[in-house]
Every structure is written in structure tokens, then in C-alpha cells.
A protein has these predicted regions:
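Cysteine-nucleophile active-site neighborhood
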Residues: 74, 78-79, 83-161, 203-218
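Hydrophobic residues at beta-strand termini and immediately following loops
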Residues: 41, 63, 129, 174, ...
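A glycine-centered loop/beta-turn motif at secondary-structure junctions
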Residues: 183-226
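Residues that mark the start of a beta-strand
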Residues: 35-39, 59, 107, 150, ...
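Active-site-proximal beta-strand elements of phosphoester/diester hydrolases
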Residues: 37-42, 151, 192-196
Length: 229
């Protein structure tokens, strides 16, 4: 027993989890009669996310996690999606730097790890939970509407609520079990994120409306750009 514990302590912690699960090259998922073009930053993305974006009328270009800001801007997307993925968000500073440069230039939607990465890009901090959130029955409250959603979760890190103060971020959702941050928004930048998995299948379907919100943000941003010329 003691020998096993010692071996566990001596095992080095890997910091390349996202690198190991992200796609190695760009690929495409097209849909009939597309209305929007989305770049999805793959940090370990589930295929059901791609299906839901396609179903919402989006052509999706899936890119490796370390795709540069310049490459993404060259694709001229209507929106950028930042996916779920494993590990500590601070282990992928290249994604954080890219998101910092994209702030205010394109609507963005992040889930799970993508949520944490957007938080860091806007100046908030993250920390490791004593007990990670796992399973498909986590109650989350939408602060603006008061609605309670049952959500699917699988993460070990969370956004520090105190660190949000003084940033452009607003907390939009909280976990009713431990009051941790479950959602963030920057309305003036058409950016929002959630800690849980709205695409979960099988799993609760309470939060699939978030994909519609992403579509609405892209449409609103497009209209705003057209107005200002």
C-alpha cells in the first residue's frame, strides 16, 4: 500500500493533455444551406458539438488548439467556439493569448475548458476544486432569468468568483450545490461561456438553448458591423 502511494507521488504530472487530444490538422464539417461560418478551437471537442453547430446552420472549421490569431482572422469566421477539454487551463497559454487578441473582434462561445480559457483571457483566475464536478445532475441557476437547469458536468477546475470583479466579465450562472461559477458573459463583446456541457448526449437537454444564443449573437454582431459600415 505504502509503496503504491509513493509511486503515485513520484509520478510526474503531465501538462500536455490538450495537445494529446486536439486534432493535428484543420478539418471541416459542412451543413446544407449554411447561414454562419464558425471556427471551433479543438481542445478535446466532442463530436456532438459539431453536430449541434451544423444543425444550427453553421459551417464549422475545426482547428488545432495552437492555431494562431492570424490564422483564425484570415478565415473570417462569424463566430469562434472554444471547446471542452482535459486538464488545467493554465497549461495552454497559447490559447489564452489567441483569445485575448480576439476579444471584441468576433462573437465567442466557450464550454467547460473553453469557459475557463475565456475567463483567463479576460483577466479572471481559475483554481482546482477539492472535489471535481462529475455527472449529469448538477443544478445550475441562470442569474438573469432565475431559471434552474439540470446540467451535465465533468471538470476539476473552476473560475474564481472573486477574481471576476474588476474585469469585463459578468457571472451569469452559478452552481446551486457549491455556489461555484457556472457561466460568464461579456455582452458588449458578444462573448459568453458555461462550465457545463449543453451538448451532452445522453444527458440533460435543459441547456441546448445556448447554441441558439450563439447564433443570435453572431446575427446581432453581423447587423452591428453592417450598420457602422
Amino acid at each position: 500500500m505504502e509503496e503504491g502511494l509513493q509511486r503515485m507521488k513520484e509520478t510526474p504530472v503531465r501538462h500536455d493533455a490538450v495537445k494529446r487530444v486536439s486534432c493535428k490538422k484543420r478539418w471541416y464539417a459542412r451543413t446544407a444551406n449554411p447561414k454562419y461560418s464558425v471556427v471551433a478551437i479543438d481542445c478535446g471537442m466532442k463530436m456532438n458539438i459539431v453536430r449541434m453547430l451544423n444543425k444550427s446552420g453553421c459551417n464549422v472549421t475545426i482547428v488545432p488548439y495552437d492555431t494562431s490569431y492570424e490564422e483564425i482572422r484570415f478565415m473570417n469566421p462569424d463566430g469562434v467556439f472554444i471547446s471542452n477539454g482535459p486538464g488545467n487551463p493554465e497549461d495552454v497559454p497559447e490559447v489564452i493569448r489567441t483569445l485575448q487578441k480576439l476579444r471584441g473582434e468576433v462573437p465567442m462561445f466557450g464550454i467547460c475548458l473553453g469557459h475557463q480559457l475565456l475567463a483567463l483571457a479576460y483577466g479572471a483566475k481559475t483554481y482546482k476544486l477539492k472535489f471535481g464536478h462529475r455527472g449529469g445532475n448538477h443544478p445550475v441557476k441562470d442569474i438573469e432569468t432565475g431559471k434552474i437547469e439540470m446540467t451535465s458536468q465533468n471538470h476539476s477546475y473552476a473560475v474564481d468568483d472573486a477574481s471576476v470583479e474588476g474585469t469585463p466579465l459578468t457571472i451569469s450562472h452559478i452552481n446551486l450545490l457549491d455556489q461555484t461559477v457556472e457561466g460568464l458573459t461579456v455582452k458588449e463583446d458578444y462573448v459568453f461561456s458555461v462550465q457545463y456541457h449543453p451538448e451532452s448526449a445522453p444527458g440533460p437537454q435543459d441547456s441546448t438553448y445556448l447554441f441558439n444564443r450563439f447564433i443570435q449573437n453572431m446575427e446581432a454582431y453581423r447587423e452591428m458591423i453592417n450598420r457602422v459600415g
